[in-house]
């Protein structure tokens, strides 16, 4: 029986993509206090691979300990207040940097966006939807996945 484990990779250094999104959303008239971005890696595995976290942490193209923080997520779906952007016609990968990962049947990558107000709370769903439609997702080749 297969299941999916999700890992988030965030930057410990300033995130230029999140900064650019913040500036652009402001110019588009959206009231956002902060933008948080993460790469989410989804691994479809057979059984229970207790070593997967250590394996993912050792793959330099996913996680560089000098600038990234790696954490396993509780769910393989976006949290409330979050949107994941994915390629529209995605074919799951089976290799990372040309290497297979034992026990992994499929690998998918998402970009997670969370928009916060000035108090650090999630912006209202309508504001998140506006951001997705106006900037965060290009429907020609991407899909937005919400909670």
Per-segment meaning from a language model:
Residues 1-147:
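Core nucleic-acid recognition elements
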């Amino acid at each position: 029986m297969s299941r999916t484990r999700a890992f988030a990779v965030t930057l410990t250094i300033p995130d230029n993509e999140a900064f650019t999104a913040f500036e652009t959303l402001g110019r588009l008239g959206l009231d956002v206090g902060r933008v948080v971005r993460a790469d989410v890696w989804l691994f479809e595995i057979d059984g229970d691979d207790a070593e997967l976290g250590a394996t993912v942490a050792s793959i330099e193209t996913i996680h560089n300990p000098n600038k990234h923080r790696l954490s396993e997520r509780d769910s393989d779906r976006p949290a409330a207040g979050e949107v994941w952007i994915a390629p529209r016609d995605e074919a799951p990968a089976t290799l990372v940097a040309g290497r297979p990962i034992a026990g992994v049947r499929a690998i998918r990558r998402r970009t997670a966006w969370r928009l916060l107000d000035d108090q650090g709370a999630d912006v209202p769903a309508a504001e998140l939807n506006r951001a997705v439609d106006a900037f965060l997702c290009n429907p020609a080749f991407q899909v937005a996945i919400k909670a």
